[in-house]
Amino acid sequence: MAAYAAFKHVELYNVGKAKKRVLRPPGGGSSDIFGSEMPQTPRNVKNRMASNIFAAEKDNGVKNNVRQGAHRFYFIGDAPRRGQKTVDSHSRLFGEPTRPITPGKNHMKSSIPFGQNTEAVAAQKLLTTNGHYNGKSGSVSSASSSVSSSTENLKMNSGSRSEGNPVTGEGYKVVANEYSQRQESSNGGTPVINKNRIPPGGYSSGLW
């Protein structure tokens, strides 16, 4: 009971009473700490009846008058905000950074050489690519000669294939016998016996 009596005078008499608050900060209601009077600026009141169709308002900066979603409409005399240039403090203090001038690339110009020296240009390119000739000793093959040689090889292969029937294998020359005869003549002495190898699926598969 003594604990209740000791606590009673601290808390119970303050129940329901509001705390005292400071209504004004020290020094008055203004935030001026130096005591000088602030200049009173007149309040701007917008004239809502004034028309701004033909000219931008003098007091206000550039603004968007009507906005509807992504579409923005500008009246005569107004300019979009994107046109305003932002002032960078670095460029204002140190000037514009100097950028190296790069020449413009002509994208319409063809990279294929035309004219009479196409063979010489192709030969020069092949000569300088790897620093050595293109597989043939003492000669540089150009693109046109490689194309013509590849077409000749195709003609020769197609001619040899047309002699026989690829399905049955009839009419083809037996290449293994020619190969064994060549080796006999080259060695001169003992003939080398080569076994004829049959491809998987036989000769009638069309792959061989």
UniProtKB/Swiss-Prot annotation:
The keyword Cytoplasm applies. InterPro entries: JUPITER. Coiled coil: none annotated. Binds to all microtubule populations. Residues 82-93 have a biased composition (Basic and acidic residues). The gene is Jupiter. The keyword Methyltransferase does not apply. One of its GO terms (biological process) is positive regulation of microtubule polymerization. This is Microtubule-associated protein Jupiter. It is found in: Nucleus; Cytoplasm; Cytoplasm, Cytoskeleton; Cytoplasm, Cytoskeleton, Spindle. Keywords: Cytoplasm, Cytoskeleton, Microtubule, Nucleus, Phosphoprotein. One of its GO terms (molecular function) is structural constituent of cytoskeleton. The modification Phosphoserine is found at residues 30, 111, 139, 150. Residues 151-165, 178-189 have a biased composition (Polar residues).
